[in-house]
Amino acid sequence: MRIHYLLFAFLLVLLSPPAAFSKKINNPVSCLRKGGRCWNRCIGNTRQIGSCGVPFLKCCKRK
């Protein structure tokens, strides 16, 4: 059972984006701080200002 914890920690580190190399919004907390929301796609009068950490979620803000 201990191997599950190690595997989870390894995947967490492997899949986390390196924060030092990117100044873009790339997590939900940063998105909310910038006044945006995480959506599948930006619709209507919103524009994409970043991503929310996963490829299919975008950080959208009103124009």
Swiss-Prot record:
Top-level taxon of origin: Eukaryota
Subcellular location per the Swiss-Prot or TrEMBL entry: Secreted
Annotated GO CC locations: extracellular region
Keyword Secreted attributed: yes
Induction of synthesis: By bacterial infection.
GO BP field: defense response to bacterium
Short name of one Pfam family: Defensin_beta
Protein name as annotated: Beta-defensin 3
Classification lineage: Eukaryota, Metazoa, Chordata, Craniata, Vertebrata
